[in-house]
């Protein structure tokens, strides 16, 4: 929620707003999606955040075995997925997961 609130919590700025913006941006060409290397070739990369292509300013945290935090500021929704998926390295898993989270955001977001 801290990132969705631009670094503020309960009216107090905890992290600089510009740092938050920079951390979820792919300003350098080599950080933008798509890129040639795996893993996650469909996603750009910020400061420990994976950034899907699109215009909704989404960003994701991806952990091992299919764990995700999906944040969509445009739809004002955060989706957290925990799990122990042994096939987490399956081809197109990231693309499918982002599509799934986008459907959730479209259905339940603002």
What are the roles of these predicted feature ranges?
Residues 85-87:
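A short acidic/small-residue loop/turn micro-motif
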Residues 3-7, 27, 53, 82, ...:
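Sec/Tat-exported extracytoplasmic proteins
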Residues 90-110:
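Short, gly/Ser/Thr-rich active-site loops of penicillin-recognizing serine hydrolases
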Residues 15, 41, 96:
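Short acidic-hydrophobic sequence patches enriched in Asp/Glu that either
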Residues 24-78:
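Active-site Gly/Thr loop motif
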Residues 1-25:
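Active-site-proximal binding-pocket segments
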Residues 7-11, 32, 89:
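Short acidic/glycine-rich loop or secondary-structure boundary segments that cap or lie
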Residues 1-8, 67, 72-83:
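Active-site-proximal alpha-helical segments within enzyme catalytic domains
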């Amino acid at each position: 929620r801290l990132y969705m609130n631009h670094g503020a919590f309960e009216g107090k700025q905890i992290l600089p707003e510009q740092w938050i913006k920079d951390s979820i941006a792919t300003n350098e060409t080599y950080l933008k999606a798509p890129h040639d290397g795996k893993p996650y070739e469909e996603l750009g990369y910020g400061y420990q955040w994976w950034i899907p292509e699109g215009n909704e300013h989404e960003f994701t945290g991806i952990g091992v075995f299919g764990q995700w935090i999906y944040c969509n500021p445009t739809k004002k929704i955060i989706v957290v997925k925990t799990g122990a998926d042994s096939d987490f390295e399956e081809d197109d898993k990231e693309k499918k997961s982002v599509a799934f989270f986008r459907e959730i955001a479209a259905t339940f977001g603002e």
